[in-house]
């Protein structure tokens, strides 16, 4: 019952406090721990069946800055996955394509936020970032302004990416460079989880129920006040 109560609170928080902050909010968007999602700015859109996983110590930060000089915009596609600790900050435009997966602690930005010589210039020529469909961005990667990542490509963990990344390749390193090519005919995207199974969301709930079955209210209290 405690989990059901928490889920009810999360749903209420998501639809009454977070949804109105989005320019567009698609259907069946799933946000785990929505109280740890920061949404700042008016021009932020999220499409159908997107999944955002937040955590108390690793919130997700979506910031589209608006001033007299800049108008940031963030567009998140269908079926995407964003993991804990991700920060997406825009002063121009950041577009993330359908079925893209973003691992933990990734930073995506379309601005340097300060000039090289004029440190009072807080916008410093932003350039749009475009991430195509079915891209996989590894943990702790940094995607810099002006970056374009082609469809199906993978960014290795800890990479720093700037410039144009072709489709169907693995890029990794600092600065990131091509490691290998990928076969574009072999991919199965996150979209298939939702379009090929009418019970996907119910299956997730069933898995969660089985995982939590051994837990109890007393055990939860002990974990907070008397952790091992």
Residues covered by each model-derived region:
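Domain-scale signature associated with acetyltransferase and cell-envelope carbohydrate enzymes
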Residues: 1-109, 132-133, 151, 167, ...
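Glycine-rich NAD(P)-binding loop of Rossmann-like domains
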Residues: 69, 121-131
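Beta-rich strand-turn-strand
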Residues: 87-93, 140-154, 159-163
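Conserved catalytic-core motifs of eukaryotic protein kinase domains, centered on the activation segment
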Residues: 112, 119-121, 147, 181-182
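Short glycine/proline- and charge-enriched loop/turn segments
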Residues: 115-122, 187-192
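A short, glycine- and basic residue-enriched loop/turn
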Residues: 129, 146-147, 168
């Amino acid at each position: 019952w405690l989990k059901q109560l928490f889920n009810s609170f999360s749903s209420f928080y998501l639809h009454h406090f977070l949804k109105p902050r989005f320019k567009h909010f698609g259907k069946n968007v799933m946000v785990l721990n929505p109280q740890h999602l920061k949404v700042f700015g008016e021009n932020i859109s999220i499409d159908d069946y997107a999944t955002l996983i937040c955590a108390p110590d690793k919130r997700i930060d979506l910031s589209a800055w608006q001033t007299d000089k800049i108008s940031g915009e963030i567009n998140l596609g269908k079926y995407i996955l964003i993991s804990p600790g991700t920060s997406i900050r825009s002063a121009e435009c950041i577009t993330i394509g359908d079925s893209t997966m973003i691992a933990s602690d990734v930073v995506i930005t379309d601005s340097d936020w300060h000039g090289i010589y004029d440190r009072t210039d807080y916008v410093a020529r932003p350039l749009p970032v475009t991430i195509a469909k079915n891209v996989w961005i590894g943990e702790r990667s940094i995607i810099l302004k002006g970056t374009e990542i082609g469809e199906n490509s993978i960014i290795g963990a800890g990479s720093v990416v700037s410039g144009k990344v072709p489709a169907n390749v693995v890029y990794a390193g600092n600065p990131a460079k091509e490691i290998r090519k990928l076969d574009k005919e072999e991919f199965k995207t996150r979209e298939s989880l939702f379009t090929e199974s009418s019970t996907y969301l119910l299956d997730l709930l069933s898995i969660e129920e089985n995982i939590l079955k051994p837990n109890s209210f007393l055990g939860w209290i002990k974990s907070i006040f008397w952790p091992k």
